[in-house]
């Protein structure tokens, strides 16, 4: 893709640089020998791509061909947003949650043609009614934050599902590990419309 943003990170030193693909979809950069590199690509209205390579051979490398498969984002796509945290039984965003929401805000501001539902889910512990109310408040808290960052209100809707869409067997009365319950406590983005 022409004009895609590619971030190249030297995993040994932590140094990274950002490039834009040329008219043939390529980037050029100078790498160090005997290093591991990770790459991530970003292009509006597409899912991000990732890859890696290393230069741990003794010969000079003049060219490395890596291909990223970057699918168009389409209606119905669902993405889990990691690292969104709330205190127990609260709907106030914790400060460490803002980094992921800032990334989402940047994406939505870059893609004003996309309308999304931000949904919050709980585990099955507690009453269904309380979980539904709590999840709606948490979803709204995230949406309010995104609107404060400039995301148009018309492009995002909050929806709490409570314990209504569990991703595993951990319903009422089923013994589960904390990790299994955690899998159900999640925040997701669903694409409602792409113009």
Outline where the language-model segments fall.
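Periplasmic peptidoglycan-binding/tethering modules of Gram-negative envelope proteins
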Residues: 1-115, 178, 192-195
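Periplasmic OmpA-like peptidoglycan-binding domain that tethers envelope proteins to the cell wall
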Residues: 119-195
């Amino acid at each position: 893709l022409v004009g895609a943003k590619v971030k190249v990170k030297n995993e040994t030193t932590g140094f990274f640089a950002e490039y834009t693909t040329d008219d043939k979809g390529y980037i050029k950069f100078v790498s160090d020998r005997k290093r591991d590199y990770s790459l991530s690509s970003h292009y509006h209205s597409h899912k991000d791509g990732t890859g890696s390579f290393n230069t741990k051979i003794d010969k000079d490398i003049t060219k490395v061909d890596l291909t990223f498969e970057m699918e168009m984002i389409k209606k119905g796509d669902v993405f889990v947003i990691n690292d969104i945290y709330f205190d127990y039984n609260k709907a106030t965003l914790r400060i460490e949650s803002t980094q992921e929401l800032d990334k989402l805000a940047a994406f939505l501001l870059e893609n004003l043609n996309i309308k999304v539902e931000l949904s919050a889910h709980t585990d099955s512990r507690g009453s269904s009614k309380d979980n539904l109310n709590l999840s709606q408040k948490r979803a709204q808290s995230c949406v309010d934050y995104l609107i404060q960052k400039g995301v148009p209100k018309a492009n995002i809707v909050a929806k709490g599902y409570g314990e209504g869409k569990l991703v595993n067997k951990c319903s009422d009365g089923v013994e589960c590990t904390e990790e299994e319950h955690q899998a159900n406590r999640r925040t997701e983005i669903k694409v409602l419309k792409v113009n």
